[in-house]
A protein has these predicted regions:
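Accessory beta->alpha helical hairpin/"wing" motif in late/C-terminal subdomains of nucleic-acid enzymes
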Residues: 53-76
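Short amphipathic alpha-helical interface segments
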Residues: 1-38, 42, 70, 74-75
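A short, conserved structural fragment
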Residues: 44-54
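Surface-exposed loop/turn and secondary-structure junction residues enriched for glycine/proline
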Residues: 14-17, 51-52, 60
């Protein structure tokens, strides 16, 4: 099953976090690409971040980022 465009956008936003930690946050500004703003909102709705505009990763978000980074290493 291929990733949807929305899922790829969510992965891009998630990948902006430098490490799987609740101590490092990001901010998606109002002038960012609309698809990135929407992706950040969806990540928040799914419980991966603590704010609609990025914020900090939740425990679930940290786990997701760890898995994303592991996948990137496998594909490199």
């Amino acid at each position: 099953m291929p990733f949807s465009a929305n899922q790829l956008d969510e992965l891009k936003v998630l990948n902006h976090y430098s490490q799987p930690s609740s101590m490092t946050g990001i901010k998606i500004h109002h002038d960012a690409a609309p698809e990135m703003i929407e992706a950040a909102k969806r990540l928040h709705e799914k419980g991966l971040t603590d704010h609609q505009d990025g914020g900090y990763l939740t425990d679930l978000g940290c786990e997701a980022l760890e898995n994303l980074q592991a996948l990137e290493r496998l594909l490199a």
